[in-house]
Structures are given as C-alpha cells and as structure tokens.
C-alpha cells in the first residue's frame, strides 16, 4: 500500500513536464482503442440481426460523436474528406442544377448528363433543374417524396442560396441539406467524388455535441478506423480553436450505446491549450496580488476620508477656546452687529425726545412698505363715506385729517436729539433702506392698486363741488270755493 501511495506523486512531475513538449493534437488519439470500440459495435449489430432475423444486406451507419468545450456562437457546416467512401454504389444521389439560358428544363437536364459523362461520373442517379423543382415539387407531399427517395443531395454552387425557400424545413431537420459543388471546375470528377465519399459536420448553436457519419457496418474494420483518424486530423485544422476545442470523442451506431475513444482529461479549456501548470499558478498569483493591492488601497482611502471628516468636525471647537483666553473671559461681539444695534437704539432716543405724542418713526429693519400699509389702512377707512348715511360735508372733514397723519413722517428729522451728527446718521440710514427696498418687494406688502384708486377718487372728489340741497318753495294751497 505504501508503494502504491508513493507512485502517483513520482509520476506527476513527469506528466507536468511532458505536457508542454507534446502539444495537444490528433496524435493523442489511440488507434487501438478505436479498433476495439469498432469491433465491439460490429459484434453488437450482428447479434441484433440474428436475434431479430433481419436481412443480411441491411447495414447500419457508423457515427463519430464530437463533444466540444464551448457551444459555438454561430452554426458551422464543415465538409470533411474521407479516404474510404461511406456510401455504396447503390446509394441514390440527386443533383440540382441551374437553368441554362434559352433552354428548357429537359434540354438543361440532357446538357448536364453529357457534362457528367464526359468527366466519367456515374454515381449521380437523377438531375433536377431549378425550374422543375419550383413547378413539380411545390406541394408539401411532393417535397416529402423527394426527401425520402434519395440518400444524398448535391447542388450547383450558383443556386445554393435559393434552395432553402423551395425545399422546406424537413431537409434541414433530417440533416439532408444539399452540398454545394462547382460544376464549372476542370476537376469536376474529383470534387463530386470527394463530396459523395466524404462527410459533413453540422455544429449547431443549441449544444456542444454533434455527430459525423464515418462509415457503415458493411465496411471492413480497418477502413472505419482510418476514417476516424482522418476526421480527427481534419477537425484539428477546420475547427475555430483547432484541436483544443475538442473535449470528448465517441463511436456509435444508429441503435447502440456510444463508446468513448478520446478524452482530453483536463478541467478547463486553458489547460487544453498546452499551458504549463506553473504558468497558470503564476497567473493566479498575479491576479490575487492585484486584488489584495486594490483592497489595501481602498482601505487606506477610507481611513483617510474618516480622518479628514474627524478633523473637519474638531476644527470649530479649538477656535472658540483659543479666542476665550485672549478676551480675558469677557464676551465680545463683532463690529457689524454693534453698528446695527447702535442705529436701532438711536431711533427710540429720538422718539423719546420728540414733542409729538404719535410715534410714527419706523425702525431700520422695517421697510417703507410697512408704512405704506398703514397709510393704505387709513385710506381704506376713508373710503367708507359711501356707507355712512351722513351728508357730504363729513367727507371733507375726513379728507382734511389725512395730511395730519402723513405730516409726522415729514417732521421726523425736526425732533430734537442729543447731537446733530446722530440726526444725519439716522437720515442716511433711513434713505439707504428706502432706496434698497424700492427694488425688492415685501411679501407682506399689500398691492398698490387700491392706493391708486383712493387717490384717483380723492382727486375726482376734490374737483367736484359739493352739492347743497335746494328746496323749491311750495305753492300755497288755495281753498276750493264751494
């Protein structure tokens, strides 16, 4: 047990060292393993024939199953040539040809028969021009009969793109798509023989597994093995990623189990490309290092951001503490608020010294809009003479009272103060505030429309003279004479 346990590690370095020297290719396919699988499948098919009493002439097809590492993004159709033909002489082959100009369908058929006889081709059983295909095989049942009556279809390369719309989906579902051939080539016999004797690999987007026809049970074993090896070599040349894209190979018949022939024995496609294990480890280590470096950088950036935030929060606290000892514990204020308070305090002093009893001075913070609201309120009060039942003389009295209300604003600077400098300051501040408030509107200010209406009504009422009631003398009643 100890010896068996010690053997695998000793062999592992040899295998790892041998992988780069022997790149992956069709040479890795073991012909002896393929031969054993083919013999087992032939024995199985013979036993089935004897058990079911089938005809001896009936042959089953051999298939090579190919499993790829990745599902291709596009459908592929690869033509592969084989050293030994997989179709017997009894196979029925159909050829679709182009319509020749100024010739009928029968004449075109005769023309291509002569062409094939001149090149010594006798494997094609029927020729169908494109015009007859459109007319005679338009119905669904006719297409099915055409599909079942032939084993293989060939078409002229000039009309290949026109066939799918006329053949239908059943040709493509049953993998009997016509193979294109150049009928104008000088080596026409070689092309047609390769096409009939060869095979086609259809790789679909729906899965990674596809099958290739490589022979039948009536062929000798060695011919089937040679066909398998030839297909493996052509796969290594025509697949998108060469031999690296091949994962598994199986051999099977139509009604048998698939037997494995080749396996790449790798866990990923990167290892199939012949990369060394050391190189893979280096790549993994580089990636891990980069990830760790990025994580460390992110952590450092987060720490720096936290420190900056803490410093920004702690900045205002030391500034207040530093200012307090300089003042000696006495709180100080900024010069700007002192000027404002001084300006505001000057107004009440002027109000106290004023001789008028009605204080109409407006503070600095208050805009002249507030004063206008007061005047408008007084004006609204004056507008009530329509409602008052008194005579028109009462209106004149109320009109006389309005200038008395507005006079104190004009007489504001006349109030005695403590000094002439203070009066001048008060005037300048009031004028500045008024000028600044002209451009800005106070949301509390009432609209100016009623004010204009009041003055218009007042002017109109001033122009009109007061009307006095004149009583006409009543006629004395004359007593009626009786």
UniProtKB/Swiss-Prot annotation:
Glycyl lysine isopeptide (Lys-Gly) (interchain with G-Cter in SUMO2) crosslink, residue number(s): 252, 427, 453
Pfam family, one: Ribosomal_L1
Compositionally biased spans, kind Basic residues: 472-482
Recorded GO MF terms: mRNA 3'-UTR binding; mRNA 5'-UTR binding; RNA binding
Modified residue annotations for Phosphoserine: 354, 384, 388, 461
Modification sites for Phosphothreonine: 367, 407, 415, 457
Membrane-crossing residue ranges in chain numbering: none
Assigned GO CC terms: chromosome; cilium; cytosol; nucleolus
Family matches, as InterPro entries: eL8/uL1-like (IPR050257), Ribosomal_uL1-like (IPR023674), Ribosomal_uL1/biogenesis (IPR028364), Ribosomal_uL1_3-a/b-sand (IPR016095)
Compositionally biased residues, Basic and acidic residues: 293-304, 426-452
Compartments, record wording: Nucleus, Nucleolus
Assembly notes: Interacts with ING1. Interacts with KPNA7 and KPNA2.
Stated role: Regulates cellular senescence through inhibition of PTEN translation. Acts as a pro-apoptotic regulator in response to DNA damage.
Family, per entry: Belongs to the universal ribosomal protein uL1 family. Highly divergent.
Descriptive protein name: Ribosomal L1 domain-containing protein 1
Annotated source species: Bos taurus
Name of the gene this protein is made from: RSL1D1
């Amino acid at each position: 047990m100890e010896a068996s346990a010690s053997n695998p590690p000793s062999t592992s370095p040899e295998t790892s060292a041998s992988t780069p020297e022997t790149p992956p290719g069709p040479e890795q396919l073991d012909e002896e393993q393929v031969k054993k699988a083919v013999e087992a499948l032939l024995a199985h098919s013979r036993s089935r024939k004897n058990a079911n009493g089938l005809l001896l002439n009936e042959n089953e097809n051999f298939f090579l199953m190919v499993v790829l590492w990745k599902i291709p993004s596009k459908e592929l159709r690869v033509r592969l040539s084989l050293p030994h033909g997989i179709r017997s002489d009894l196979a029925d082959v159909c050829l679709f040809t182009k319509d020749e100009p100024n010739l009928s369908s029968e004449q075109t058929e005769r023309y291509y028969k002569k062409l094939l006889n001149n090149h010594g081709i006798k494997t094609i059983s029927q020729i169908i021009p494109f015009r007859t295909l459109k007319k005679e095989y338009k119905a669904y049942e006719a297409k099915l009969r055409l599909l079942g009556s032939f084993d293989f279809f060939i078409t002229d390369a000039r009309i290949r793109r026109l066939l799918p719309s006329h053949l239908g989906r059943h040709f493509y579902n049953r993998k009997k798509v016509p193979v294109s051939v150049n009928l104008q080539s000088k080596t026409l016999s070689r092309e047609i023989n390769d096409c009939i004797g060869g095979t086609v690999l259809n790789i679909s987007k729906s899965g990674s597994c596809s099958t290739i026809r490589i022979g039948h049970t009536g062929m000798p074993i060695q011919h089937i093995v040679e066909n398998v090896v030839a297909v493996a070599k052509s796969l290594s040349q025509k697949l998108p990623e060469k031999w690296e894209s091949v994962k598994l190979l199986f051999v099977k018949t139509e009604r048998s189990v698939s037997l494995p022939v080749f396996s790449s024995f790798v866990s990923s496609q990167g290892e199939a490309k012949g990369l060394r294990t050391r190189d893979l480890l280096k790549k993994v280590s580089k990636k891990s290092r980069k990830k760790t470096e990025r994580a460390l950088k992110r952590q450092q950036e987060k720490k720096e951001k936290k420190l900056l935030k803490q410093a920004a929060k702690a900045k205002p606290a030391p500034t207040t503490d530093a200012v307090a000892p300089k003042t000696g514990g006495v709180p100080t204020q900024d010069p700007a608020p002192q000027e404002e308070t001084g300006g505001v305090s000057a107004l009440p002093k002027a109000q106290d010294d004023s001789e008028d009893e009605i204080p109409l001075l407006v503070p600095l913070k208050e805009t002249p809009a507030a004063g206008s609201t007061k005047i408008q309120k007084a004006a609204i009060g004056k507008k009530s003479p329509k409602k008052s039942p008194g005579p028109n003389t009462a209106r004149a009295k109320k009109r006389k009272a309005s200038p008395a209300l507005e006079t104190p604003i004009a007489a504001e600077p006349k109030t005695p103060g403590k000094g002439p400098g203070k009066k001048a300051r008060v005037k300048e501040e009031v004028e500045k505030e008024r000028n600044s408030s002209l451009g800005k509107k106070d949301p509390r200010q009432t609209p100016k429309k009623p004010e204009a209406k009041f003055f218009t009504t007042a002017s109109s009422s001033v122009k009109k003279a007061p009307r006095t009631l004149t009583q006409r003398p009543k006629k004395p009643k004359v007593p009626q004479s009786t």
